[in-house]
From Swiss-Prot:
Residues 760-843 form the Smr domain. This is Pentatricopeptide repeat-containing protein At1g18900. Belongs to the PPR family. P subfamily. The lineage of its organism: Eukaryota, Viridiplantae, Streptophyta, Embryophyta, Tracheophyta. Keywords: Repeat. The keyword Cell cycle does not apply.
């Protein structure tokens, strides 16, 4: 699945919204959605730029589809011979130092295309002075200029002076428009101006087209014929390699090298008296423009202070080290230091230390940055105290401050508090901006409240804020994730018609939505449209394509995409390796999943929890309990804290245990995680006469898990209810389900399509959960009919293929639901051509719902 970490560069509220899969959590790092923040550039992307100054990093993995188990060709680097799964031990799971491999040779046919961007135009006659004399004079002027700089004598130039006395022919004519120079959001150079730079080698072509391994679970009959999707992908892939811009080892000028959010003019949102940070950066404490030496000193101070705060935890030692620096810090420098701090305790200590320094006074920027730091740590009590101090110091919160508060409450799933801040900012006279509305739209859509999200979209337009590319991307993702893909696609087309150009993030969102809906041809078409629009794939794009190929059964082609990604100078990170571990694991190929995990370690990467979860799921799927235990122990040894998904995997394995021994072993694994969910199950009380004690117990636990993302909570509740149902605790299962439904953990489980026309959606549930959910929902209908006399005109029960369906064409959920409905003689039937949907309507449905046994169906 696509994971949140793949696109963390834009925003944790608005850009990371399309990577929330079942293997990741939504919580991530710093947010940069605010109007006065700098553009976000990830650390990984900065490393890519630094790597560009040296030779290319060797490919750590070049898969050969025809040979299972050999994933590193000898001519590139030393082959990695992974241990068999049965033989691995704890040390092999830990990251080890791997010696660097020989660098790949530089491409000899790299193209210098600088002349195509800026052309020198000589007007009049060229200088008759010998070129040697010109160079000599220019050198003398340069030496004098550098001497002035060293003595802090900054020369000033008027419009007609030439700093170095260079001939005018070497400059671009300022009166002439330069068509080849465009903004960063527009493709600067047409592809057809260049020859093919990276022709696909014969070896690579043969690797993609090699006969597939018959042992793969995805092959079978599909091996005899290839769909148009794979052929189309090869065609697009070749066109990418053939038509891409020249890429050298020291050039990273590609459009997608650094992804940044759309620029928002912060001046529009800053009230009088609250200086803009971009303007303040060039001014000293007195408001005068900084000289060159002052500006350099400012950066020097920020670096020195940050270095001290990185070395010490806040305390007397840190204070003494700061005093020994003997530096005078102003509010701007303090703000820059606070932005670099991740530990809220250190940041808060430094903040109050500054407040005690003679002559120092915090401004609105430092207060706002500190609010953001506390918000990431969910320290809302400290935030309220800080806001009171901010007002007492004469700094009124502005739009950016309120946006940070809304984002902080939203990422912690405190939606009511976020809306309260939204109302308070308007009462205080701060007008919401696009960031405000987009944040509210995103957090409500992620929590399953699509109606509120769309209402905020309407309010944004009514407030005179027309949607831009950023806004459209948020809304499109919200609609798609809520199951309204046609509406999302319609909005995408509307966006283009309105002259709002989609960016790479928008294309990635649309491709991901179509891929999740198994519309692989549409995903491929969007991939082609994206390239025709001048965008090159980034790591997120490549991951989506790999996932699409993997789910279609073409895992070797997915590995070929991995190789192509490396050739385009994208360095694979943990989520990319984790995706391939996950794809091979779901295919049932434990050996290949293990090989990719080992390849990640040999690439010098440290495993993360989602990747370990993928490998853990692989072991559990084939009943390798001992290997799963070893992996879990190594996770703990690495300091990786098992997540909610980790516990969910173990609980599902325990539910499906083939023997009491397996179930006991899984129970030990669950206990070793130390997750609060285990104590929740151990302390589950026996249901009382009305089940209120179980509901209170479940309610307290879900409150504890409040800040977890909805997908993780949904997965755990599904596993818990399924476990309780299959272990005979059906009354408890029903009570837990009712609490989860009240807390909107399953927002799509029950929906009114139109007046008195209801839809019960069970297709994302396990069979035990589906039976419990259906029984309690039908009992709710009966209760409503008896209380108000309102009767449903039609009820559709959608089972689909079901969460636990292993083989195409069969659904355990459908079978369990059909059996339950038949036992109680229900009037539900399946319409022709749609065996996954049971329909009940009219008077027969109402008479059946009023029967007393409907109230106790879940106890069967």
């Amino acid at each position: 699945m696509i994971r949140a970490k793949h696109i963390s560069n834009l925003s944790s509220t608005a850009r990371s919204f399309f990577l929330n899969g079942s293997r990741t959590s939504v919580t991530d790092g710093n947010s940069c959605v605010y109007s006065d923040d700098e553009n976000c550039v990830s650390k990984r992307q900065q490393l890519r730029k630094e790597a560009g100054q040296t030779e290319k990093r060797p490919s750590s993995i070049l898969p050969k589809p025809s040979v299972v188990g050999c994933i590193l060709p000898g001519e590139v680097t030393k082959p990695v011979v992974p241990k068999k799964v049965d033989d691995f031990g704890r040390p092999s799971l830990l990251p080890q130092h791997v010696s660097s491999s020989p660098a790949l040779p530089l491409k000899s046919h790299s193209v210098n295309y600088a002349s195509t961007v800026v052309r020198e135009e000589v007007e009049g006659k060229a200088s008759s002075e010998p070129i040697g004399d010109q160079i000599f004079k220019a050198g003398i002027v340069a030496v004098n200029f550098l001497s002035d700089l060293s003595n802090c004598k900054i020369p000033s130039y008027d419009g007609g002076s030439d700093a170095f006395g260079l001939p005018k022919s070497c400059m671009v004519d300022p009166t002439r428009p330069i068509s080849s120079v465009k903004s960063s959001n527009v493709k600067a150079i047409r592809r057809e101006h260049f020859a093919k730079i990276y022709p696909r080698s014969a070896a690579k072509e043969s690797s993609v087209g090699t006969t597939r391994n018959p042992s793969s679970n995805f092959r079978g009959a599909k091996e005899a014929e290839r769909t148009g999707f794979v052929k189309g992908f090869r065609q697009v892939s070749n066109s990418v390699v053939g038509k891409s811009l020249p890429t050298t080892n020291n050039t990273y000028g590609k459009r997608t090298s650094v992804l940044q959010r759309p620029h928002i003019d912060s001046n529009r949102f800053v009230p009088s008296g609250f200086s803009n940070s971009s303007v303040e950066m060039m001014k000293g404490p007195s408001g005068t423009a900084l000289t060159s030496r002052q500006y350099c000193n400012s950066g020097h101070i920020v670096e020195n202070v940050s270095s001290v705060l990185r070395r010490f935890r806040w305390g007397p030692a840190a204070e003494e080290a700061l005093q020994n620096l003997g530096l005078r810090i102003d509010a701007y420098q303090a703000n820059q230091v606070l932005k670099q701090m991740n530990d809220y305790g250190n940041a808060l200590g430094f903040f109050y230390w500054l407040k005690r320094q003679p002559g120092f006074k915090h401004d609105g920027h430092t207060y706002t940055t500190m609010v953001g730091n506390l918000g990431r740590a969910k320290q809302f009590g400290a935030i309220n105290k800080l806001l009171d101090e901010m007002v007492r110091d004469g700094c009124q919160p502005n739009t950016v401050t309120y946006n940070r508060l809304i984002h902080s409450y939203g990422r912690a799933n405190y939606l009511n508090e976020a809306m309260n801040v939204f109302n308070q900012m308007q009462e205080a006279g701060c007008k919401p901006d696009r960031v405000t509305y987009c944040t509210l739209i995103d957090i409500h859509a992620k929590a399953g409240f699509l109606d509120i999200a769309m209402d905020m979209y309407q309010r944004m337009q009514a407030g005179g804020l027309s949607p831009d590319t950023f806004t459209y991307s948020v809304i499109i993702n919200c609609l798609g994730k809520a199951g309204h893909l046609p509406a999302a696609h319609k909005l995408f087309c509307e966006m283009v018609d309105q002259g709002c150009t989609p960016n790479l993030v928008t294309y990635n969102i649309m491709m991901d939505l179509h891929a999740k809906a198994r519309n692989y041809q549409n995903a491929l078409k969007l991939y082609r449209d994206m390239q025709n629009a001048g965008f090159e794939p980034d790591k997120v794009t490549y991951s989506i394509v790999m996932e699409v190929l993997g789910h279609c059964g073409y895992l070797e082609e997915a590995e070929a995409v991995f190789t192509e990604m490396q050739q385009k100078n994208w360095i694979p990170d943990e989520p990319v390796y984790g995706l391939l571990v996950d794809l091979w694991g779901k295919a049932g190929n434990v050996e290949k999943a293990w090989q990719w995990y080992q390849a990640m370690l040999h690439a010098g990467l440290r495993p993360n929890v989602p990747t370990c979860n993928s490998l853990l799921s692989t072991f559990l799927r084939v009943n390798k309990i001992a290997e799963a235990y070893e992996l879990l122990q190594n996770m703990l040894a690495l300091g990786l804290r098992p997540s909610l998904q980790t516990y969910t995997l173990l609980l599902s394995c325990c539910t499906d245990g083939r023997s009491k021994l397996d179930m006991g072993f899984c129970g030990q694994l669950m206990a070793s995680t130390g997750h609060p969910a285990h104590m929740f199950l151990l302390k589950m009380p026996a249901a009382g006469p009305d089940g209120e004690n179980v509901r209170n117990h479940a309610n307290n636990f879900l409150d504890l898990m409040h800040s977890e993302d909805r997908e993780s909570k949904r997965g755990l509740v599904d596993a818990v209810v399924d476990f309780l149902h299959k272990s005979g605790q059906k009354e408890e299962a029903g009570s837990v389900w009712e609490v989860a439904a009240q807390k909107n953990v399953f927002p799509d489980a029950l929906r009114e399509k139109s007046c008195s026309y209801w839809l019960i959606n069970l297709h994302v549930m396990s069979e035990g959960t589906a039976v419990t959910a259906l029984s309690r929902t039908l009992a709710w209908f009966r209760k409503q009919m008896l209380a108000s006399g309102t009767c449903p005109s039609r009820i559709d029960i959608v089972t689909g293929w079901g969460r636990r369906s292993r083989v195409t064409g069969t659904s355990m959920v459908r079978q369990a639901v059909e059996e339950l409905l038949n036992i109680f003689g229900s009037p539900f039937f399946t319409e022709s051509g749609n065996s996954g949907c049971f329909v009940g309507s009219g008077e027969p449905l109402n008479r059946w719902l009023l029967q007393s046994h409907v109230e106790r169906m879940h106890l069967l």
